[in-house]
């Protein structure tokens, strides 16, 4: 930053005709790309979703470790990613997931002194656990035309990171959804 004022001063001294000009005509051409969509997280038959803009929370009620270990419905919650205000310039929406992972596809518990051996996975609704999205990966999923109109139905699930290794306690994890458009 210190070189910028010095350089500007030298240019002004070296080009006195430009420095004393009274009129300056500038032709500026810009290409405006289409704006992106507004993406929100909404309830969809599961616990309440709180928050707005870029910070949402979904709270799964207290659940027994036996439910987590057996992948019972009580150890998961449904929600939707909903797109609105999308530009007509986009025909495709792609989503990737980021977060601190443990055990490949599960996001680690960030609660201090919390549950051990338990992670959080996110997948499309009504699919097997083997389809959990892989965080921090180039894998992405594309929204269908119906999903662009009505939202992408997803499930967040608590699962043991290693069978039989789960321990009870508080659980809190953060996942970030990233969107690209074509």
Where are the regions that the model predicts?
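Mature extracellular/passenger domains of Gram-negative fimbrial/pilin and adhesin proteins
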Residues: 2-3, 20-182
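Gram-negative bacterial Sec-dependent N-terminal signal peptides
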Residues: 1-20
């Amino acid at each position: 930053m210190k070189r910028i004022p010095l350089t500007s001063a030298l240019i002004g001294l070296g080009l006195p005709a430009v420095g004393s000009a009274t009129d300056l005509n500038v032709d500026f051409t810009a290409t405006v790309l289409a704006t992106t969509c507004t993406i929100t997280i909404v309830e969809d038959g599961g616990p309440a979703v709180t928050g707005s803009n870029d910070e949402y929370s979904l709270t799964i009620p207290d659940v027994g470790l036996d439910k987590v270990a057996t992948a019972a419905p009580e150890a998961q919650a449904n929600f939707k990613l909903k797109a609105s205000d999308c530009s007509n310039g986009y025909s495709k929406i792609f989503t990737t997931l980021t977060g601190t992972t443990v055990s490949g596809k599960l996001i680690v518990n960030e609660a201090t002194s919390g549950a051990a051996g338990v992670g959080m996975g996110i997948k499309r609704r009504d699919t097997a656990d083997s389809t959990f999205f892989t965080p921090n990966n180039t894998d992405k999923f594309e929204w269908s035309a119906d999903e662009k109109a009505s939202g992408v139905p997803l499930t967040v699930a608590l699962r043991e990171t290693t069978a039989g290794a789960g321990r009870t306690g508080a659980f809190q994890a953060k996942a970030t959804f990233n969107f690209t458009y074509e």
